[in-house]
Amino acid sequence: MPVTFDEAKCEITLSKDYQFFDYGMDLYAPQSTTDAQGRRIEAAWLRMPESPDGEWIGMFCIPRVTEVIGGHFYFRVHPDVDKLYARKIMSPAEASSDGYKISADLPEEGWINIGGYRIFRKDRTICTDRSRVYRNHTECRCSFSTPDLKDGFHIDVYVDANMIVVYVNQGEYVITNGVYDLKQTVEAGPGVDMVMYT
């Protein structure tokens, strides 16, 4: 829920009903601005326990458009980013070096495994598990979940060599995770129809 601000008293009141910017818990230092169309956009740094190449550590997440609908924050992939993923592919091996996108609806107990990174539906939530693609960093969380969903079980997943972003129901919730050593494979459970783009 948004905060309330009393300008005359210069006081902010926080709601008891809060939601996280991202449910992957890897993002920090969010930064906000407006784009050329006046949309509120945000980006943040991705926390990583080690450098993937031994040199640089951390990266910016995909810019997202922030909207409040019915008191709920939606964080949607910026349309200028989304339109870059226009060519259909059949496997990650066909993807450009900029990564790829997977769109799918997850039925009950449906799952997708992206090179060792698992996304699955559990009851009314979408969950992720990066334990197989996180180089045994046991000091960090590896399992994540959205709160109960209201808008369905659609996911748009943006895959990069060291970052996976799961947009659930066009931004109802988002899970961003740092990853290492992803395999170039994608598998889906029974009843999961998915489409890939690069």
Residue ranges of model-derived segments:
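Loop/turn-rich, solvent-exposed surfaces of beta-rich toroidal or solenoidal domains
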Residues: M1-P2
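Beta-rich accessory regions
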Residues: F5-T198
